[in-house]
Amino acid sequence: MEKSLHLEIVTPDRLVLSEKVDYVGAPGYEGEFGILPNHIPFLSALNIGSLYYKAGGKTHWIFVSGGFAEVSDNKVTVLAESAERAEDIDLERARKAKERAEQRLAQAKEKLDSARAQAALQRAMARMRVRGAA
């Protein structure tokens, strides 16, 4: 039996990560799910949040802004709208984005404006959580 997984995280712009890992935890729409080696194949939609993986006894965090995860043959492929490693997140930029989203949410007059502001707030807060977890 295989003792590791190959994790790839891809965005429309770039390959964010490609490495052997021991475990992957991801933010699914129905809640967080975990993947160990030899997991049954499946496909899941991802929510905005924290994806983490364990490799070499360390836990690593990555912000993902939605997308999909596919598990097959000890390979986890994440296709994300955007993804950032914890160490690459600009915390000050995330704080400013959070403040702007909160202001837009308070001033939203239409349902669409409110939904966009809520999504922006969720992304900013997830980035801040991931950066804090690093």
Curated annotation (Swiss-Prot):
Answer whether the UniProt record assigns the keyword Transit peptide to this protein.
no
Please give the InterPro entries that the UniProt record associates with this protein.
ATP_F1_dsu/esu_C_sf, ATP_synth_F1_dsu/esu, ATP_synth_F1_dsu/esu_N, ATP_synth_F1_esu_C, ATPsynth_dsu/esu_N
How does this chain sit within the bilayer?
A: Peripheral membrane protein
Which terms are listed as keywords in the entry? ATP synthesis, Cell inner membrane, Cell membrane, CF(1), Hydrogen ion transport, Ion transport, Membrane, Transport
- Which Pfam family would be a valid example here? ATP-synt_DE
Q: Where in the cell is it found?
A: Cell inner membrane
Q: Which domain of life is it from?
A: Bacteria
Could you cite one Gene Ontology molecular function of this protein? proton-transporting ATP synthase activity, rotational mechanism
Coiled coil start-end: none
One cellular component term (GO) for this entry is:
proton-transporting ATP synthase complex
Indicate whether RNA-binding appears among the record's keywords: no
Q: Which family does it belong to?
A: Belongs to the ATPase epsilon chain family.
Subunit note: F-type ATPases have 2 components, CF(1) - the catalytic core - and CF(0) - the membrane proton channel. CF(1) has five subunits: alpha(3), beta(3), gamma(1), delta(1), epsilon(1). CF(0) has three main subunits: a, b and c.
PANTHER family annotated for this entry?
ATP SYNTHASE DELTA/EPSILON CHAIN, ATP SYNTHASE EPSILON CHAIN, CHLOROPLASTIC
Q: What does this protein do?
A: Produces ATP from ADP in the presence of a proton gradient across the membrane.
Q: What is this protein called?
A: ATP synthase epsilon chain
Q: Which organism is it from?
A: Nitratidesulfovibrio vulgaris (strain DSM 19637 / Miyazaki F) (Desulfovibrio vulgaris)
Q: What is the lineage of its organism?
A: Bacteria, Pseudomonadati, Thermodesulfobacteriota, Desulfovibrionia, Desulfovibrionales
